[in-house]
Amino acid sequence: MHPAAEHSPLGKSSEYIATYTPSLLFPISRAAKWAELGLTAQTLPYQGVDFWNCYELSWLLPSGKPVVAIAEFSIPADSPNIIESKSFKLYLNSLNQTAFATVEQVQTTLEQDLSTAAGKPVGVRIRSLSDIEGEGVATLPGVCIDDLDITVSSYDRPQPELLCCDESQIIEESVHSHLLKSNCPVTSQPDWGSVVVEYRGAALDHSSLLAYIVSFRQHSDFHEQCVERIFLDLQRLLKPEKLTVYARYVRRGGLDINPYRSTETLDVNNRRLARQ
């Protein structure tokens, strides 16, 4: 378990506070997890963002009438801190019985509080239900590798040694899998996700990639660090000209987390998948 996470509200019974309480937010430094991967804030080999989508945002108008909305949060991948997910939920719940004059006031409040917790500016977008109703669900780019036949014997740790490639072939492709699963490092609850790999480099063996993704199945780590580990393992193997790893996780407690790491300029459509 991440040492700071032991002191977070995750996995503990909590009082649900219904009036605005920004102190509920619990930041966790990224530094310890970066160190496990041999990284520091100054040596990150990627740029990126963590997209959080909130489906349970509500507050009151001055008249006392409730408003409901959906919010998108963009936390920079190089921010000093992540925000522990249960504390994020508790904080958002604290808006439920709080009056705001305008949606802009809600947005400004969220931007200020989340940026303070993350240690870097956090983007906030608040959308009405009617804005989203016609969007439907997205499909992931490239080839789905989930139907490949593989033999799996171990699930307790990520196994980069399973990965292999053909260095004689340099290709550019996108592949994806819906079989990503890891466990919360605090509660051991399952985290279900889909992952996209886009790259230009030595041709990656698809069966080996699928076996590697499945090897995360009993691994305990936060969503963000799982994606960073995948990125680094593929970067070491492929030595690619460009590489993007992007995961979309199933929501829990009204929030889903979608980490994006890339050697390239951010270019992603934050649209939900069928399981989200």
UniProtKB/Swiss-Prot annotation:
GO terms for molecular function: preQ1 synthase activity. The active site is at 184 (thioimide intermediate), 191 (proton donor). GO terms for cellular component: cytoplasm. It catalyses: 7-aminomethyl-7-carbaguanine + 2 NADP(+) = 7-cyano-7-deazaguanine + 2 NADPH + 3 H(+). InterPro entries: GTP-CH-I_C/QueF, NADPH_dep_7-cyano-7-deazaG_red, QueF, QueF_N, QueF_type2. NADPH binds at residues 85-86, 252-253. The keyword NADP applies. Its EC number is 1.7.1.13. It is found in: Cytoplasm. Substrate binds at residues 83-85, 223-224. GO terms for biological process: queuosine biosynthetic process; tRNA modification. Keywords: Cytoplasm, NADP, Oxidoreductase, Queuosine biosynthesis. Pathway: tRNA modification; tRNA-queuosine biosynthesis. Its main location: cytoplasm. It is an enzyme of class 1 (oxidoreductase). It holds the Pfam family QueF_N. Catalyzes the NADPH-dependent reduction of 7-cyano-7-deazaguanine (preQ0) to 7-aminomethyl-7-deazaguanine (preQ1). Belongs to the GTP cyclohydrolase I family. QueF type 2 subfamily. Homodimer. PANTHER family: NADPH-DEPENDENT 7-CYANO-7-DEAZAGUANINE REDUCTASE. This is NADPH-dependent 7-cyano-7-deazaguanine reductase. It comes from Pseudomonas savastanoi pv. phaseolicola (strain 1448A / Race 6) (Pseudomonas syringae pv. phaseolicola (strain 1448A / Race 6)).
